[in-house]
């Protein structure tokens, strides 16, 4: 359980990254979504005790982030977006070193590392230099660290940013095997829908939406996405589920041959809020 109370972060240049976040994140998989600069990473860094808040506080399983830093780090694994394995080390060495650093004996770390890498499909590569691995495999090594350490809480910051679709699915499969509470930040709506039980939408350091995927979609029941099909195969996706206007000069050049009506998705919920915030 993560609880935050009026959490604020203002950087020295005056940028307000978090503007009074008060939320409770219960024991399950939670996705924090939002555009770049919404405050997702700042939130993750503060709650994982890597960054001090300007004001406010947070608790992780009852532990105070300002007073119980060491205890929180012992029960949490945080994987930042920029994390990358040390190229000369093998995945086996990476995971074993990580576990020993958290207090596990060398013999136990060796056994657990090998078994966990096998479990996540890295048996063939566990003794190869990490700089020979694909982007997806490198990210899986870090998920493997979290799985092997068996912490109470795992924080994943943008776990699949920059990965190709195949690598992204590989990482998703690995994440689904994590035990304990998992909190991930992402701007991929498909990722949030596939991995999380609950979604929290951040925008400009504030919480705009908070609930299960099913609950969020039900709030927009009756709204649909409409795509207009033109004669030259040019499709127009209608934002905010409605057509605001059609320029008559454009209409002269195109013939509407048909349309497709689709059910609203989490991606659409995100886009709707984006329009509302910017207007």
Q: Residue spans of the language-model regions?
A:
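C-terminal coupling/interaction segments
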Residues: 240-279
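ABC transporter nucleotide-binding domain
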Residues: 170-247
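Conserved ABC ATPase signature
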Residues: 88, 129-136
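Catalytic Walker B motif of ABC-type/P-loop ATPase nucleotide-binding domains
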Residues: 154-158
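Conserved ABC transporter NBD signature motif
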Residues: 56-67, 71-72
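Conserved structural motif at the start of ABC-family nucleotide-binding domains
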Residues: 2, 17-18, 73
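Conserved ABC ATPase "signature" region
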Residues: 96, 100, 107-125
């Amino acid at each position: 359980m993560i609880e935050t109370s009026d959490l604020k972060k203002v950087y020295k240049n005056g940028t307000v990254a978090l503007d009074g976040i008060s939320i409770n994140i219960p024991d399950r998989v939670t996705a924090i979504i939002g555009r770049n600069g919404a405050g997702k990473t700042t939130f993750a860094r503060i709650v994982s005790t890597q960054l001090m808040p300007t004001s406010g506080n947070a608790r992780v399983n009852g532990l105070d982030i300002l007073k119980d830093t060491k205890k929180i780090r012992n029960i949490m694994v945080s994987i930042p977006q920029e994390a990358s394995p040390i190229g000369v080390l093998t995945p086996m060495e990476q995971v074993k070193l990580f576990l020993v650093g958290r207090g596990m004996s060398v013999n136990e770390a060796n056994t657990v590392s090998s078994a966990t890498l096998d479990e996540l499909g890295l048996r063939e590569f566990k003794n190869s230099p990490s700089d020979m691995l694909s982007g997806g495999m490198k990210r899986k090594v870090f998920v493997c660290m979290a799985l092997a350490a068996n912490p109470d809480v795992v924080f994943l910051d943008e776990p699949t940013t920059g990965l190709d679709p195949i690598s992204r699915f590989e990482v998703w499969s690995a994440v689904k095997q994590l035990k304990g509470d998992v909190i991930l930040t992402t701007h991929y709506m498909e990722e949030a829908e596939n991995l999380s039980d609950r979604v929290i939408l951040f925008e400009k350091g504030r919480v705009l939406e908070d609930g299960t995927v099913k609950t969020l979609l039900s709030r927009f029941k009756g709204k649909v996405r409409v795509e207009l099909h033109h004669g030259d195969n040019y499709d127009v996706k209608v934002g905010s589920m409605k057509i605001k206007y059609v320029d008559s000069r454009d209409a002269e050049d195109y013939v509407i041959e048909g349309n497709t009506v689709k059910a609203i998705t989490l991606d659409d919920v995100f886009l709707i809020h984006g329009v509302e915030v910017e207007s």
